[in-house]
């Protein structure tokens, strides 16, 4: 999985960037999404607030903003078109590879790690996996969706080795 990482805060260590990369690759493998691409940007609460207002019309900072990329391509190609035109097939493959982007608030991650009594590393892993599941179509609007998403989230974090301790 290709993941573009951007630290707008200047506060994210190389180790934390590496952990985020690794846990997202681990989650991608679990979901069979190894061939996908995404972006992760680490932001401040101020920037998170701006993004939350812009994209979700919510006037406060949040821990992670997940923007799922759903291409709205109206052009239909049949298999023969793609076989006859390798460039078109490659373009369509690249177009389909990008699944979305996450904005993780470093400030919120620190606050929540302290509030929940676990490590900053655990909170960052939680936010990365939570956002990753969102951009892969998981949600928690209903009790059933919440049970499925949170169960999978905990399964990934535990298998990776990021427990609540």
From Swiss-Prot:
Zn(2+) binds at residues 130, 134, 140. InterPro entries: MetalPrtase_cat_dom_sf_prd, YbeY, YbeY_CS. Its cofactor is Zn(2+). It is an enzyme of class 3 (hydrolase). Signal peptide: none annotated. Binds 1 zinc ion. Its EC number is 3.1.-.-. GO terms for molecular function: metalloendopeptidase activity; RNA endonuclease activity; zinc ion binding. SUPFAM superfamilies: Metalloproteases ('zincins'), catalytic domain (SSF55486). Single strand-specific metallo-endoribonuclease involved in late-stage 70S ribosome quality control and in maturation of the 3' terminus of the 16S rRNA. NCBIfam families: rRNA maturation RNase YbeY. Belongs to the endoribonuclease YbeY family. This is Endoribonuclease YbeY. It comes from Streptococcus pneumoniae serotype 19F (strain G54). The gene is ybeY.
């Amino acid at each position: 999985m290709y993941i573009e990482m951007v630290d707008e805060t200047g506060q994210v260590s190389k180790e934390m960037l590496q952990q985020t990369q690794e846990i997202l690759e681990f989650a991608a493998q679990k979901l069979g999404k190894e061939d996908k691409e995404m972006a992760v940007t680490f932001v401040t609460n101020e920037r998170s607030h701006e993004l939350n207002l812009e994209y979700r019309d919510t006037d406060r900072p949040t821990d992670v903003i997940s923007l799922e990329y759903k291409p709205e391509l109206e052009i239909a190609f049949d298999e023969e078109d793609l076989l006859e035109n390798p460039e078109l097939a490659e373009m369509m493959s690249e177009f389909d590879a990008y699944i979305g982007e996450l904005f993780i608030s470093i400030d919120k991650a620190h606050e929540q790690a302290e509030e929940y009594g676990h490590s900053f590393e655990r909170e960052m892993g939680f936010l990365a996996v939570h956002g990753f599941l969102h951009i892969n179509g998981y949600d928690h609007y209903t009790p059933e969706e919440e049970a499925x998403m949170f169960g999978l989230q905990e399964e990934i974090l535990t298998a990776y080795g990021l427990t609540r301790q």
